[in-house]
């Protein structure tokens, strides 16, 4: 999965506006091989509960480090912000969702 914004930046998700590659400058395959996407592959799964898959919403401690290691930059065309600032807004949600997700995951017979 990926998202290409109006400026041609290839992002890992429509909600995660960070990239290190632009479709107008590189082939699609090169864009998929950008360091940020490689960081995604290295990090997945971001925890043992697949009901919490996102490195921003459910694992907000992950995305800022991934963006930093990849040397990616903000591609938000309206309001650029650091990955740290974005993810700071997600910690409360992640903390509330984690126990519910773990309960549901356990009910399906998975280890928590």
Mark where each language-model region is.
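Flexible mid-to-C-terminal extensions adjoining Fe-S/redox cofactors in radical SAM and related proteins
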Residues: 15-112
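Short, acidic, Ser/Thr-enriched surface-loop or helix-capping motifs
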Residues: 4-5
């Amino acid at each position: 999965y990926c998202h290409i914004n109006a400026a041609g930046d290839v992002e890992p998700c429509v909600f995660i506006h960070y990239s290190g590659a632009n479709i107008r400058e590189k082939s699609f395959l090169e864009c998929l091989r950008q360091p940020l996407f490689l960081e995604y592959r290295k990090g997945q799964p971001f925890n043992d509960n697949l009901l919490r898959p996102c490195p921003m919403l459910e694992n907000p401690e992950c995305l800022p480090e991934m963006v930093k290691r990849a040397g990616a930059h903000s591609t938000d065309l309206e309001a650029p912000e650091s990955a740290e600032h974005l993810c700071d807004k997600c910690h409360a949600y992640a903390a509330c969702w984690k126990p519910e997700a773990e309960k549901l995951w356990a009910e399906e017979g998975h280890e928590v």
